[in-house]
């Protein structure tokens, strides 16, 4: 760990070229310039060969350590020379007042290996038909060479008309560059493009800001998506381009260096932006070298190859995680600089509120519009704790929406020159706790503190998780971004508008005696990720030290530490344990100890799930957590030693169901005949409403024949499917396979067999998007299941094609048997790679080994499934050790991802 670990502004060691020198001597000979090509070489086949040689040379040079900047310049020059040679070959130099102009990225001179080559054929007057045909042949040849050429053929007047009407065309023209042809014509175009009649700065600037905002929204306003677009994601190359476009239009600056001369960029900021651009260029260049066609997305299947090409080291996914950590940190810096510089441009170009005087807030700060500003630009350097005073001011003053550009510049400067972390200053610690105690702590202070790297400057541990990704399909965000989203979700529980989505949490949150302790637990719940070891245990220790430093008493410190250590407990218990088993509830309640701790924990659990992945939270998970919460609350109120009377519960369920059925004037004798066939477990694990629903239909049905019921009301957050059928081997596998083939995910299964051998199985299913089964699919699913039940012999179900994304993940199959309080059941946990037909395959193995399944709880976590199965042997007893071992071997063999889902 380096001495500047609390500094968020240090350049990653891999930012220029990890483990390799930059700009080493060329390892292969530079291909000849296209200007030297003889006429007989200017055919498609020969030119293709020359282009392939040049691409190979680019790759070889890059791998030998030559900088991306030099190779981008080299490709731009090579394409310039090729187009110049072809321009003369086609005789365009003889056409008066005609020019070939590079526009867009090509105009900027930024040609990566697969970049588009955008050109404009510019003429004073419309081309003749003959000349137009010749231009068509020229462009067709470029396309035949497999170059990504975008072209337009326009007169000067057409260019100006199109440019005035379309900001994208205008931007292309602003960064246009002459390749060959009539220089005077090109200069005339430039003169018009940079005149106030074309796109005045006062119109161009807001248009580019709106364009950037729209682009950011497409990427959910974060560069932290785990498959980012290097060019277009927030903090990517486009954000640097936006600065250059505005500077070029307003100041005439053609580079970052020239922006320093105009006084709108300091030398340090220029250097930082160049570092960021250089890093992003290296990643983009490497990505283009491994792809067959143009794309800028760092998809999962590309990340390892790019990381290896950039010489990131480590086992397994470590190279990817290191590269992506550097990427996210760089994009954070670009985003902050982009925000600050655009605000400076805003003042210079639009001169907003120039006449409005700043309004003093106190001796240190003032308001400019709705932005907080320093009254003494050296305050942060002289008194670093004033940084925390500013954020405490922001949390208390709802009129403040952000930080003024020059103050942000001073904040960045002071941040870099901190002698020690801010949390070492007593006043800063007091201010931090005051911030946490405010109802709007997250949105008004912690979020901007994170955005401007002040959280990192305050507590060095935070810096460890900034940009920390996890190479899986479950975690949609980096650890720091996820943590901020947890905090925002917790703050939303204080808002009545959140009640429809989270009724329980909105009810409980105001009853928490100290919400700041929950925020502190959220801040630390994943702080130890990426360090090795159990992140929950390590984080619990970290927060104890933090609590001691910040003056929390023993009770407060122990509560926060317990929340961090047990932040996964409620989620795991609800989703991967049998929460209808009183012993499970009793064990969970013993760990929780009090209703107050239960309220804190359920709030943290819900926020954690919601902030992990946008698709993760659904009504099924909500119903599980509510069920666990209320069962635990009841247990805590009853007392830990008092377990529920199961016989009384069975009796109560039967009486309640009977009362419901009597309203329908049912035949009670026939009902008694059906119920007498059922074991006590059936009544214990179904609600009175479920029992009545089953009975109504069974009373009207030939009970010796199969019956499939699909509930029209979402039950426990999903659609309930009830199956009544003569029991037989492979029945569960057949049903699970049919549901999987219909693209339904099973989340829960309750398996019962009547005294006379009838299967009475209940499945809770969801659509792929987490919603209950669509009404228009009910009849089709019911018919398909009836067909499966009537088949005399089990047939392996046809399996859906696996998701392409699953190809890039390997999850070892793990089988674990949980300790139980009974000798009648075994509780088996299974972790494996998610794959089509998985549940059916598992069911086949159970049937092969003559095991009976009594319940299943299915959790899909990204590319991984983590399931719980309740099993018994053929004698209705718990599995003996030798049978457990055999089952483990069969499951591991059948679900091995290397056999089932090919890895790239």
From Swiss-Prot:
Feature: compositional bias, Low complexity: 7-23
A Pfam family this chain is assigned to: ACT
GO molecular function, one term: [protein-PII] uridylyltransferase activity
CDD domains: ACT_ACR-UUR-like_2, ACT_UUR-like_1, HDc, NT_GlnE_GlnD_like
All copies of domain HD, residue ranges: 479-601
Cofactor(s) this protein cannot do without: Mg(2+)
This protein's UniProt keywords: Hydrolase, Magnesium, Multifunctional enzyme, Nucleotidyltransferase, Repeat, Transferase
Top-level taxon: Bacteria
TM helices/strands, residue ranges: none
Description of how activity is regulated: Uridylyltransferase (UTase) activity is inhibited by glutamine, while glutamine activates uridylyl-removing (UR) activity.
This enzyme's EC code(s): 2.7.7.59, 3.1.4.-
Region (Disordered): 1-25
Catalytic activity: [protein-PII]-L-tyrosine + UTP = [protein-PII]-uridylyl-L-tyrosine + diphosphate; [protein-PII]-uridylyl-L-tyrosine + H2O = [protein-PII]-L-tyrosine + UMP + H(+)
Record region (Uridylyltransferase): 1-360
Family matches, as InterPro entries: ACT-like_dom_sf (IPR045865), ACT_dom (IPR002912), HD/PDEase_dom (IPR003607), HD_domain (IPR006674), NT_sf (IPR043519), PII_UdlTrfase/GS_AdlTrfase (IPR013546), Polymerase_NTP_transf_dom (IPR002934), UTase/UR (IPR010043)
One of the GO BP terms on file: regulation of nitrogen utilization
Keyword Repeat belongs to the record: yes
Chain intervals for the UniProt region annotation (Uridylyl-removing): 361-719
Reported function: Modifies, by uridylylation and deuridylylation, the PII regulatory proteins (GlnB and homologs), in response to the nitrogen status of the cell that GlnD senses through the glutamine level. Under low glutamine levels, catalyzes the conversion of the PII proteins and UTP to PII-UMP and PPi, while under higher glutamine levels, GlnD hydrolyzes PII-UMP to PII and UMP (deuridylylation). Thus, controls uridylylation state and activity of the PII proteins, and plays an important role in the regulation of nitrogen assimilation and metabolism.
Record-stated family: Belongs to the GlnD family.
Entry comment, domain topic: Has four distinct domains: an N-terminal nucleotidyltransferase (NT) domain responsible for UTase activity, a central HD domain that encodes UR activity, and two C-terminal ACT domains that seem to have a role in glutamine sensing.
The protein's name in its UniProt record: Bifunctional uridylyltransferase/uridylyl-removing enzyme
